[in-house]
UniProtKB/Swiss-Prot annotation:
Component of the cytochrome c oxidase, the last enzyme in the mitochondrial electron transport chain which drives oxidative phosphorylation. The respiratory chain contains 3 multisubunit complexes succinate dehydrogenase (complex II, CII), ubiquinol-cytochrome c oxidoreductase (cytochrome b-c1 complex, complex III, CIII) and cytochrome c oxidase (complex IV, CIV), that cooperate to transfer electrons derived from NADH and succinate to molecular oxygen, creating an electrochemical gradient over the inner membrane that drives transmembrane transport and the ATP synthase. This is Cytochrome c oxidase subunit 2. Residues 14-26 are mitochondrial matrix. It comes from Nothoprocta perdicaria. Cu cation A2 binds at C163, E165, C167, H171. Mg(2+) binds at E165. Cu cation A1 binds at H128, C163, C167, M174. It catalyses: 4 Fe(II)-[cytochrome c] + O2 + 8 H(+)(in) = 4 Fe(III)-[cytochrome c] + 2 H2O + 4 H(+)(out). The keyword Electron transport applies. It is found in: Mitochondrion inner membrane. Belongs to the cytochrome c oxidase subunit 2 family. Its cofactor is Cu cation.
Length: 198
């Protein structure tokens, strides 16, 4: 339908005796150049503002800092004093029966269920990516830059992820395990972890 209309208007313009006025009309060209530019600017400005507002996380219950290294993750619970640990993959030779190969870690990230969690992600050496697909989270870890993301777990459980950026020879040995627990269990875990040394 659109092609037919364009062909009809083109034929009308070519057969008309006054076509020279339409073909050389600089005013028309100026209007159909400036008007779409103004419309695009009017669409872009609010869209950029909304894009930045979507990235803001209002009052999370917990802030977690994930730092990517070759080839493990370090975690800091910034709302707690001295609550940080390194998380390494458990080698296949030491893996308990029934656990997932290449996905289990020695220290899991524990978060409270039904609480907004902010994750600040960075790297200490090369590019990494903190990704837990079942939580809908993937954030690039870039040295010297802090990226943030957020998630809420709606049920208790264990969620598996991995580094999603090729970061070297042992890239596939950087699993991420997030354990979501009810708030009382999280509080007892954080108390126990902060009093003991890893």
């Amino acid at each position: 339908a659109i092609c037919s209309l364009v062909l009809y208007l083109l034929a009308l313009m070519l057969m008309e005796k006054l076509s020279s006025n339409t073909v050389d009309a600089q005013e028309v060209e100026l209007i159909w150049t400036i008007l779409p530019a103004i419309v695009l600017i009017l669409l872009a400005l609010p869209s950029l503002q909304i894009l930045y507002m979507m990235d803001e996380i209002d009052e999370p219950d917990l802030t977690l800092k994930a730092i990517g290294h070759q080839w493990y993750w370090s975690y800091e619970y910034t709302d707690f004093k001295d609550l940080s640990f390194d998380s390494y993959m458990i080698p296949t030779t030491e893996l308990p029966s029934g656990h997932f190969r290449l996905l289990e870690v020695d220290h899991r990230v524990v978060v409270p269920t039904e609480s907004p969690i902010r994750v600040i992600v960075t790297a200490g050496d090369v590019l990494h990516s903190w990704a837990v697909p079942t939580l809908g989270v993937k954030t690039d870890a870039i040295p010297g830059r802090l990226n943030q993301t957020s998630f809420i777990t709606t049920r208790p459980g264990i969620f598996y992820g991995q580094c999603s950026e090729i970061c070297g020879a042992n890239h596939s040995y950087m699993p991420i395990v997030v354990e979501s627990t009810p708030l009382p269990y999280f509080e007892s875990w954080s108390t126990l972890l902060s009093t003991s040394s890893l």
